[in-house]
Curated annotation (Swiss-Prot):
Disulfide bonds: none annotated. NCBIfam families: greA, PRK00226.1-2, PRK00226.1-4, PRK00226.1-5. GO terms for biological process: DNA-templated transcription elongation; regulation of DNA-templated transcription elongation. GO terms for molecular function: DNA binding; RNA polymerase binding. InterPro entries: GreA/GreB_C_sf, TF_GreA/GreB_CS, Tscrpt_elong_fac_GreA, Tscrpt_elong_fac_GreA/B, Tscrpt_elong_fac_GreA/B_C, Tscrpt_elong_fac_GreA/B_fam, Tscrpt_elong_fac_GreA/B_N, Tscrpt_elong_fac_GreA/B_N_sf. Residues 49-73 form a coiled coil. The gene is greA. Belongs to the GreA/GreB family. This is Transcription elongation factor GreA. SUPFAM superfamilies: FKBP-like (SSF54534), GreA transcript cleavage protein, N-terminal domain (SSF46557). Keywords: Coiled coil, DNA-binding, Transcription, Transcription regulation.
Amino acid sequence: MNKTPMTTRGAEKLREELNHLKTVARPRVIEAIAEARAHGDLKENAEYQAAREQQGFIEGRIKEIEAKLANAQIIDVTRLNPGGKVVFGATAEIEDLASGEVVTYQIVGEDEAEIKEGRISVTSPIARALIGKQEGDVATVQAPGGTREYEIVSVRYV
């Protein structure tokens, strides 16, 4: 099975969520189930049914996170030395040659992507066009809205 690239930051966020689910959410829902059981007939007990449903969601999410972490290739961006090239984990400042707009993106794993925070998926059209390029290069992006060209202004590994 292929490993999925993930930054150390992304892995840490998943570990924090996993810890919260195991130490806070799971015990809380187990307590809610026990409390609802005490109310009697389980067939018509909405509290019990809701708590069991929540438990199923929590257990499913725990398994999902554990699988993601087990299948992750965690990459420490600060230790990269790709010689100025855009690679997974790099932060690239790019200029749209048509509009002159300058934006900064970090290329991250699919689960870490958050466009509003400047993190784009390694599988996105922009990231695919940028990877392997370096400062001064022009990347051509085939996007749903048409072809766009971006000049790479700077590349950082933070």
